[in-house]
Amino acid sequence: HWQESIENIHEWSERYDLKAVIGVDEESIILAAKLSESLCIEHNSLESVKLTKNKYLMRSELKKSGLKSPWFKRFSVHETPKDIFAELIFPCVLKPTFLSASQGVLRVNSFEEFGKGCEMLSDLLAEEKVKKRGGDQANWILVEEYIPGKEVSIEGIVNNGKLKDLAIFDKPESLEGPIFPETIFITPTILDEHLQSSLLETAQSALQALGISKGPVHIELRINDHGNYILECAARSIGGLCSKVLEFKGGMSLEELILRSSLGRNVEKTQLIDKAKGVMMMPTEKRGILRKIHGIKAALAVKGITDLQTTIKPGEMLEPLPKGDRYLGFLFAEGKDQDTVKIVLQEAWSKIEVVSEEI
C-alpha cells in the first residue's frame, strides 16, 4: 500500500511545490522518509528512521556510541525461556521490539514471571493485526535490565543535527511495573538546570548516534545515580492528543511549530508560555466492551481542568495493558505549579466511572 501512496503523492507533487513530508505517528514516519527520499526533499535517512522503530537495533546503536545502556538481549519467540535463564539479570523488562505506548512491556522479577511473560508476549505477537504491523520483528522479544529512577520525556525539533528542546515533561507518578502505563505528563519540569542540561546532552548524543538530523523528536529517559539512560528515541512528535498541553508564546501549537520549522523558518527563540500544564492519559483498567462513561461533567467541573476528550466510543473494545494500545481518553489541566496540576488531574480522574460489559 505504501507504493500506491508514494505514486499518488508523486502525481500530486507535479501540481504543487512540496517542501516537506512529515510523519505524525509510528506508522507514517517510514512512509514520510521514503517519500522525502523519492522527492529529493531534505529528510532523515530511511536507515535512521528504521533504527528508531526497532528497540533492539536502537539499543545496539546507542551502546556502540558509548551511551549508558542496560544489559539487553534479543531472543526468538520460538526459543524456550529456560534457554536464556543463565544470562538473566533480575529485575528485567520484556518488550516487543516495535510496539509503542507501553504495549507489551512487562517487568519480571523471577524465572517464573519471565516464563509467564514470554508466553503472554508470544500470544500478543501472534495476533494477526500485531503480526502484520511488525513483520519479521513480530518473531522477536527484547529483554533488558530494569532501569530504576525518575522518568522524563523531551519534546524537541532537530535542524541540521542540532536539538532544539521545546519542553521537558516530568512524569510524577511512579513507573516501576509490572506494567508501565504512561499516565501524567507535566511541564515545565522542576528538575534543576544542571540536570536539564545533562539530559539534553544525552538526548543530543542519542540523536547523533542514530543519525536523526531533522524534524520533530520525542525522547524518553530515566535518571538515576548512575546517569541518564535513553528509553526511547522517536523521530516524531508526542503521541495521542498530548500535544494539546504545549502552548507556545504567540499562541502557536506544537503542530504549527513543526510546520514552520520544516519550511525553514527559525524556531530557535520559541518558548512555552510560563504556566504549569499537564495531561493525563486516562488508562484502560478493565477488559470488556465499553458501554458508558459516567462523571465527565464532574471531572470537567474540577477547578484547573481545561478539557477532557474520550478516544474510545461506547460499543468499542477496552483492552488494558500490557496487551492493549489505546487510552480511554485525555484529561488536561493547568495550575500555579506542578503539584497543583498533578492533584487536579488525579481528582478529576477519581470522578470518572467506566461501565463496561465483560466478554
Predicted segments — roles?
Residues 68-70, 91-94, 111-148, 179, ...:
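Conserved ATP-binding module of the ATP-grasp superfamily
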Residues 64, 259-359:
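Peripheral (often C-terminal) accessory segments that flank ATP-dependent C-N-forming ligase machineries
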Residues 75, 105-110, 157-159, 224:
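Short beta-strand-to-turn element immediately C-terminal to the catalytic PLP-Schiff-base lysine
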Residues 119-173, 194, 198-201, 218, ...:
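Phosphate-binding site of ATP-dependent enzymes
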Residues 106, 145, 187-188, 247, ...:
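Short, well-ordered beta-strand elements within core beta-sheets of diverse protein domains
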Residues 197-219, 225, 234-291:
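Active-site "cap" helix and flanking loop/linker of ATP-utilizing ligase/carboxylase catalytic domains
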Residues 90-108:
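Conserved anion/nucleotide-ligand pocket segment
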Residues 1-77, 322, 327:
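Conserved N-proximal alpha/beta basic substrate-recognition cap immediately N-terminal to
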